[in-house]
Amino acid sequence: MTALEEARAVRGRVAPIGVIGGSSRVVEHNLYVYRRLWPMFVTGFFEPVFYLLGIGFGIGGLVGTITVGGQHVSYGVFVAPALMASAAMNGAIYDSTFGLFYQLKYAKTYEAMLATPVTVGSVSLGAVAWAVLRGSLYSAVFLVVMALLRLLHSPLGILMLPAAILTGFTFASLGTAAATFVRSWDDFDLMNLILLPLFLFSATFFPITIYPGALQIVVELSPLYRAIDLMRSLGLGQPSWSMVPDVAYLLALSGLGLWVTSRRMMKRLRP
């Protein structure tokens, strides 16, 4: 009997610690790992800030003001909430895809965890929770930068942080679900092919109204567009009932991603 099999035999005689307790152990494991890899973690803070400085102020100097909901705002104020949503997406999606795939296929981290009272459900939720935490930290730092650059147009802008957490939750759930289908590193080329158009065409840099009517419907199916619409409404101080379907859509995709993740992880990890 191997050491892993012996550990599983012992595990069978130990009471599970619960899904929430187990998922917190998964998050704790990632925190421990990134104590040594903190430069890799910190570099993720800079990308959205560079976009904000380069596009928000660079191109913004050429564009000037833009009209949104009857308000005239600077281009930097317009684009900043969208870049914050993108920061939440990127922070969550890359850890929940590349990181999860590596731990599933090569490091066998989750198999080792299952030799303890941690369950498959805990592993799935913990992987998502860690990705959400990372995306949320990126968003929080970005929000501070927005405040320092005086790009917070309304006191409601502070509510962009919980909206960013929801965005991270959505993309972390979808990312972990997608990662369970990945067979090799080459498959991530397809994922990047999806993420780049999402970033460029989800009304990140211009209003959705520039698209023809049929294309607007397609863009509205993008989860990043829903996140941007939600966060831009808050950032510009223009709350409306259109935020309700945005939240509902993101929650629905989060639930779908969690369900697929749980099913796939159960299939791959259950001994």
Give the label of every model feature segment.
Residues 1-158, 162-271:
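Hydrophobic transmembrane alpha-helices and immediately adjacent juxtamembrane helices
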